[in-house]
Amino acid sequence: NSSLASKNYDYDYDSIQPYFYVDNEDEDFYHQQPGQLQPPAPSEDIWKKFELLPTPPLSPSRPSLSSIFPSTADQLEMVTEFLGDDVVNQSFICDADYSQTFLKSIIIQDCMWSGFSATAKLEKVVSERLASLQTARKDSAVGDNAECPTRLNANYLQDPNTSASECIGPNTSASECIGPSVVFPYPITETPKPSKVAPPTDLALDTPPNSGSSSSSGSDSEDDDEEEDDEDEEEIDVVTVEKRQAVKRCDPSTSETRHHSPLVLKRCHVSTHQHNYAAHPSTRHEQPAVKRLRLENSSSRVLKQISSNRKCSSPRTSDTEDYDKRRTHNVLERQRRNELKLSFFALRDEIPDVANNEKAAKVVILKKATECIYSMQTDEQRLVNLKEQLRRKSEHLKQKLAQLQNSCLSSKRH
C-alpha cells in the first residue's frame, strides 16, 4: 500500500513544491525534511512563494479505436494479467488505506492549488483510468470468470469534478469523505449536472469535462457556442432573445439524454436607411423628378414586401405586427425628412443672402426667400414697363425715319 500510495501520489503537485507548509505543525518549518526539497530561506523574496505554476499541458484526447478494440493476442495477454496478478487489480481499485492517504494529502486540503494546476492533472489520470478500465472490462468479458470484476469500484467512474469521491474504496465510510463544496467552493467551469451512470459498455465514449476532446452528445451545443462567440465580435444591429427547444439525441446505447440550451442571443438585421443630419450635404441641387419617382417606388416596394411577408409567414402576435408598422412608418418618415432637407438646401442655394451660410435656419431661409420673391416681382414689373417704353420709342423713331425718307425723295424730284 505504501508503494501504491507513493506511485499514485505523483500527480499531486504539492509533493514537488517547496512553497507549502508541512502537515505536522509541531515540526520546525526551516528544518529540511527527508524526501523533500529545501524550503526557502527568510532572506528570499516572499512573493516567490505565491508564484503560479506554468500552464499545464492539455488532457489527452479520446483513445482511438485501436486501443478500445485491441487484437486477439493483446486481449489474451491482458486477460491473463488481469485475472492472475492481484497487483494489477490494485491499479484499478483504491483501497481504504490509499483513500485515507489521498484525503490527507495537501492537494485536497488546499483549495487554491486544487482549483488550478492539479485539476488538469487529475483529469488526465482519470481519463487514462477510464480507457484502461474499459479495455479491462471488455477483456474480462472474453473470459468466463467473473470473480475479479466484483471488486471494481463504481464510484471511481463518476465525474472527476466530484474530487473526494474519485478514489474512495468500498470499505471507506461516508463520514471520511469530503464534500465537493468544501474542497471546491467555487467551480472552475459550469458543467451540466451528470446524468445517471451509463452501462459499462458506454464508459469509453464519455470523456471527463475540460478535456481536449468533447463527447458526441455535446458537440452540437459546443459548435453553437463557438459560432455565437464569432458573432459577438461583429456588430449586432438588433438582438432578440429566443429559447431553444429541447434537442433529443439517441446514443448508441439504450439511454436517451435530453439537452436544454440556455437563452441564446440571435442576430437580426433591420434594413433602415440612416442619415447623419450633421454631415455636410454632398449635393446642393434639387433632386429631379426621376429620383423622386424612384424613392416613391422603393417605399411602395417596402410596403408590399412587408405585406407579403405577413401573408406568407405564420400568424404573428399583435406586438410583432405593431413593431412592423412602426418600422415601416419610421422608414417612410425618414425618407420624407431627407427629401425636405434637400429641398431646403436647394432653396438656400438660390437665395443670394443665405447662399454661403450653411448654418442658416429654416425660418431665415423662408423669410429671405419671401423677400427675394417680392424683390424679383418688383424688378420684373419695372423691366416690363421699361420694355414697353423702349418699344414705343422705337416705333416713334421708325415713323420719324419714314418721314425723313419721304421728304428726301420729294426734294430730289423738284
Swiss-Prot record:
> Where do Polar residues bias regions lie?
296-317
Indicate the transmembrane segments per the record. none
Which keywords does this chain's UniProt record carry?
Activator, DNA-binding, Nucleus, Transcription, Transcription regulation
Q: Which GO terms describe its molecular function?
A: DNA binding; DNA-binding transcription factor activity, RNA polymerase II-specific; protein dimerization activity
Q: Note down the stretches annotated as region Disordered.
A: 192-263, 296-330
Domain bHLH: residue ranges: 324-376
Any Pfam family hit: HLH
Give start-end positions of Basic and acidic residues composition bias. 240-259
Gene Ontology CC = nucleus; perinuclear region of cytoplasm
- Bias (Acidic residues) occurs at 220-237
- According to its UniProt record, where is this protein mainly located? nucleus
Note down the stretches annotated as region Leucine-zipper. Answer: 383-404
Please name the InterPro entries in this protein's record. bHLH_dom (IPR011598), HLH_DNA-bd_sf (IPR036638), Myc-LZ (IPR003327), Myc_transcription_factors (IPR050433), Tscrpt_reg_Myc (IPR002418), Tscrpt_reg_Myc_N (IPR012682)
Entry text on domains: The 9aaTAD motif is a transactivation domain present in a large number of yeast and animal transcription factors.
Describe its assembly.
Efficient DNA binding requires dimerization with another bHLH protein. Binds DNA as a heterodimer with MAX.
Q: What is this protein called?
A: Transcriptional regulator Myc
Q: Give the gene symbol.
A: myc
